[in-house]
UniProtKB/Swiss-Prot annotation:
Keyword Metal-binding: yes
Binding site for [4Fe-4S] cluster 3: C57, C76, C79, C82
Record organism: Escherichia coli (strain K12)
Name of the protein in question: Putative glycyl-radical enzyme activating enzyme YjjW
Family from the record: Belongs to the organic radical-activating enzymes family.
Keywords: 4Fe-4S, Iron, Iron-sulfur, Metal-binding, Oxidoreductase, Repeat, S-adenosyl-L-methionine
NCBIfam families noted in UniProt: activase_YjjW
Family matches, as InterPro entries: 4Fe4S_Fe-S-bd, 4Fe4S_Fe_S_CS, Aldolase_TIM, Organic_radical-activating, Organic_radical_activase, Radical_activat_CS, rSAM, YjjW_bact
Lineage: Bacteria, Pseudomonadati, Pseudomonadota, Gammaproteobacteria, Enterobacterales
Gene that this polypeptide is encoded by: yjjW
Cofactor(s) required for function per UniProt: [4Fe-4S] cluster
Domain of life the protein comes from: Bacteria
Residues that hold [4Fe-4S] cluster 2 according to the record: C47, C50, C53, C86
CDD domains the record matches: Radical_SAM
UniProt xrefs under Pfam families: Fer4_12, Fer4_9, Radical_SAM
């Protein structure tokens, strides 16, 4: 029995966009960045039971019980009104789940998946749970063949990675901007620790994928292409995924930002290729 718990925003039993192959994707609640372009902004914060969402629910799926916001999954229509109203960028639908409870979901899907990806929010803000979950999977004869990945923003310290890497098969990280000033403008934090995390993971052979998000007029990749290309080449044979920003699902000023087109992505790809970065993955979809 493993009763260690985490606050879980969502479980997708079969995902083909959260790492290689078909995977169970576990989204944890809470993030230590505040990205303007976040497509899951309701996973940033954690519910403080303020109750502001309760009277807004058109299906009466929320109520206050003993001072806590309680969600009724039976009557909920998944209209997401509560997500748009929450001042905390949280969700009343997040549930506390134990390692054993998550493992029960994994076992139901095990015949149809190649692994599990823990995402968020930011997975590593609930690091002890992730370590316990991956350890349990690696120690289970029926589950140990599954690969265990994290989708992370890279803010975890070196000490934290040392705890996670023995039971983690790899991490997928975003480098949202090259310069710290640009990165802080986009996310609220600088990117020095993120760059250190990327280097550490590459050195350990655990950097499954580096991601660059093209946001027209907002990112600085091309302005710093020499440094960026040299940085990526120094990581070794790591796949680099070029993602195209779109405004669907974002809040605030990013709703007015232009979506990225092939004409926005291709100049970056060409500039990287010319400088020896050739293992590129292009967007599967432009919106």
């Amino acid at each position: 029995m493993n009763s260690r718990c985490a606050l879980v925003s969502k479980i997708i039993p079969f995902s083909c966009v959260d790492g290689p192959g078909s995977r169970l994707a576990l989204f944890l609640q809470g993030c230590n960045l505040r990205c303007k372009n976040c497509h899951n902004p309701w996973t940033m914060g954690r519910c403080n039971d303020c109750g502001e969402c309760v009277p807004q629910c058109p299906h009466q799926a929320l109520q206050i019980v003993d001072g806590k916001v309680v969600w009724n999954a039976v009557v909920c229509e998944q209209c997401d009104t509560c997500l748009k109203r929450c001042p905390q960028h949280a969700t009343p639908m997040a549930q506390s789940m134990s390692v054993d409870e998550v493992l029960s979901h994994v076992r139901k899907a095990v015949l149809f998946i190649e692994g599990i990806t823990v995402s968020g929010g930011e997975a590593t803000t609930q690091l002890p749970f992730v370590v316990a979950l991956f350890t349990a999977i690696k120690n289970d004869p029926q589950l140990r063949h599954l690969t265990c990945l994290v989708d992370s923003n890279g803010m975890l310290s070196e000490t934290g990675w040392e705890k996670l890497l023995p039971v983690c098969d790899g991490a997928m990280l975003d480098l949202k901007a090259w310069g710290s000033e640009c990165h802080q403008q986009l996310t609220g934090r600088d990117n020095q620790q993120i760059k250190r995390s990327i280097y550490l993971l590459a050195e350990r052979g655990k950097l499954a994928e580096l991601r660059l998000l093209v946001i027209p007029g907002q990112v600085d990749y091309l302005q710093h292409i020499e440094e960026l290309a040299a940085f990526i080449k120094g990581l070794g044979d790591v796949p680099v995924r070029l993602n195209a920003f779109h405004a669907h699902g974002v809040y605030g000023e990013a709703q007015s930002w232009a979506s990225a087109t092939p004409e926005d992505v291709e100049p970056l790809a060409d500039a990287l290729k010319v400088r020896g970065v050739s293992r590129l993955i292009f967007p599967a979809l432009y919106l």
